[in-house]
């Protein structure tokens, strides 16, 4: 029964792992729902800022902030949003593939890049593969704050304002639904025309304090910060959804493996019993 003992031990080990993956799946479901709530709560804020920026830009057409002006691209910047932990399927790998595809398009034009990295997995990726990382932040926790991101985002915004980079992209995962998370490379700067114009019909002519141009300068920075924050929150929802699916698959696979091993165990046990009976019968016949 030595073979049967080993199989029984494997079954016990897999059952133990199955309990862990099942528990992790349930935790991921709970965390995903909380992240979805934060994601939904942040959208109206970013949308309202975009509308105010559009109104200010329309009211002051002669003023063009550097964040709104196209220029020749000599160097680009990427804000890359990744997870802090693994066990979330191909979430980060697919994101890196999208990043590398965009990066290749620019490098084919002899344009190099700087990176601002959010998340431990992103930091590990650039340590292994190289890249000029100018800012990095990780371990934001389950409830990130926009204040945690301001310092890192300021580094790349200053680089853009000073002309050290000429275009800024945000690379993150978009939450399509529980089963689908899609990596996306979104241009942050210069602002696309739709972002800069906002909603232009049926607006009152407001009086702004302080000066409208000063307010526009501050809001543009705040808008970019809110976009990055929203992406971090959305990426967190994507991470938990991907982990939930990965843990469910692991739990199901463990169940299938237990069934297969149970069948092998039963066959081994039956073979051992048959052998013992044969030995007893053989011994009796010899007597």
From Swiss-Prot:
Keyword Cell inner membrane present in the record's keywords: the answer is yes
Matches recorded under Gene3D superfamilies = 3.40.1380.10, ATP synthase, gamma subunit, helix hairpin domain (1.10.287.80)
Report the GO terms under cellular component: plasma membrane; proton-transporting ATP synthase complex
Family according to the record:
Belongs to the ATPase gamma chain family.
Instruction: Share what the entry says about its subunit structure, partners included.
Output: F-type ATPases have 2 components, CF(1) - the catalytic core - and CF(0) - the membrane proton channel. CF(1) has five subunits: alpha(3), beta(3), gamma(1), delta(1), epsilon(1). CF(0) has three main subunits: a, b and c.
Q: Which organism is it from?
A: Ectopseudomonas mendocina (strain ymp) (Pseudomonas mendocina)
HAMAP family registered for this protein in UniProt: ATP_synth_gamma_bact
- Which cystines does this chain contain? none
State which gene encodes it. Answer: atpG
- A single BP term in Gene Ontology: proton motive force-driven plasma membrane ATP synthesis
Query: What is this protein called in UniProt?
Result: ATP synthase gamma chain
Say what the protein does. Answer: Produces ATP from ADP in the presence of a proton gradient across the membrane. The gamma chain is believed to be important in regulating ATPase activity and the flow of protons through the CF(0) complex.
Keywords from the named record: ATP synthesis, Cell inner membrane, Cell membrane, CF(1), Hydrogen ion transport, Ion transport, Membrane, Transport
Its placement in the membrane is given as:
Peripheral membrane protein
Localization annotation: Cell inner membrane
Q: What is its main location?
A: membrane
Q: Pfam families, from UniProt?
A: ATP-synt (PF00231)
What domain of life is recorded for the organism? Bacteria
- What's a single GO MF annotation on this record? proton-transporting ATP synthase activity, rotational mechanism
Question: Which lineage do the record's taxonomy fields give for this organism?
Answer: Bacteria, Pseudomonadati, Pseudomonadota, Gammaproteobacteria, Pseudomonadales
